[in-house]
């Protein structure tokens, strides 16, 4: 009888050792919130290898992994029905997640999304050569830059989605240029690779009395428009990714009234008239 009980005990012990992350539930694990509105389950106890088991579900796919830490950080992996491989990397401080999808070989990237705690993210899609073909940069405030048709030289189409309207333009290896046209006037917003913004205005009007010129002040992020040597209005491109417009008095010497936030593309065009 004693040998029988010992045998049963040994079998149960072996079963326990073979248990993996698929057995995690609310009783034996802790749920940890992650950037990107994801969650990871972390085992309360270490497994037979002395590590904590991790489990997460992304787009209905279960990802599994282990970690030396019990805070939720680590690397989890899974395989889709089409045999493509998914890898989720959670930073040590839980402030960032990196979700990567690879082809069946596990090396060729298909897509990649890095999400931070402040809700900002960068999402990339790759072509057959492993080069970035599409990219979306989402800021913490929800505004975003979208790039499509990216070529090997870094050029492509660009779009900035702001609150209430969209600016469109082009991407080069050096910068993003977003353009708004109204009559003879072209307003260009340039964003460097480092994120620095500069704005310029070009007017093809041949009449000196109505031709618009503009000066950019990088310190205040303000474009001051002038007509016939008189300042007419200020366009301010704020750090909050909004644009405001404020008029000058008839003499062009001082601002009057209050700055008004632009919420429609037509309002930018009206400011260029």
Curated annotation (Swiss-Prot):
A Pfam family (short name) is Lipoprotein_1
Could you list this entry's UniProt keywords, alphabetically sorted: Cell outer membrane, Lipoprotein, Membrane, Palmitate, Plasmid, Signal
Q: What is the effect of changing residue 144 to K?
A: In strain: 21343WI
Specify the effect of residue 127 to S: In strain: CA8
Quick one: where's the S-diacylglycerol cysteine lipidation? Answer: 17
Instruction: Spell out the SUPFAM superfamilies in the cross-references.
Output: Outer surface protein
Outcome reported for the amino acid change (mutating residue 164 to S): In strain: PBre
Entry GO terms, CC: cell outer membrane; cell surface; membrane
Indicate the secretion signal residues.
1-16
- Quote the protein name from its UniProt record: Outer surface protein A
């Amino acid at each position: 009888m004693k040998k029988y009980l010992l045998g049963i005990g040994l079998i149960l012990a072996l079963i326990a050792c073979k248990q993996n992350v698929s057995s995690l539930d609310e009783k034996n694990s802790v749920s940890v919130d992650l950037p990107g509105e994801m969650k990871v389950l972390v085992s309360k106890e270490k497994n037979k290898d002395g590590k904590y088991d991790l489990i997460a579900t992304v787009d209905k796919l279960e990802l599994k992994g282990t970690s030396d830490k019990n805070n939720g950080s680590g690397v989890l992996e899974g395989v889709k029905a089409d045999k493509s491989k998914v890898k989720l990397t959670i930073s040590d401080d839980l402030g960032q997640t990196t979700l990567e999808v690879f082809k069946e070989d596990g090396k060729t990237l298909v897509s990649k999304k890095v999400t931070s705690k402040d809700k900002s993210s960068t999402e990339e899609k790759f072509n057959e050569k492993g080069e970035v073909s599409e990219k979306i940069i989402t800021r913490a405030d929800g505004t975003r830059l979208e790039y499509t048709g990216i070529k090997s030289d870094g050029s492509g189409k660009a779009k900035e989605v702001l609150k209430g309207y969209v600016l469109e333009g082009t991407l080069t290896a050096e910068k993003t240029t977003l353009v708004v046209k109204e009559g003879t006037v072209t307003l260009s917003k340039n964003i460097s690779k480092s994120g620095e913004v500069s704005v310029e205005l070009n007017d093809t009007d041949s009449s000196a009395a109505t031709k618009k010129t503009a000066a950019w002040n990088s310190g205040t992020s303000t474009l001051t428009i002038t007509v016939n040597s008189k300042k007419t209005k200020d366009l301010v491109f704020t750090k909050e990714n909004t644009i405001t417009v404020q008029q000058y008095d008839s003499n062009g010497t001082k601002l009057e009234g209050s700055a008004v936030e632009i919420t429609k593309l037509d309002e930018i065009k009206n400011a260029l008239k």
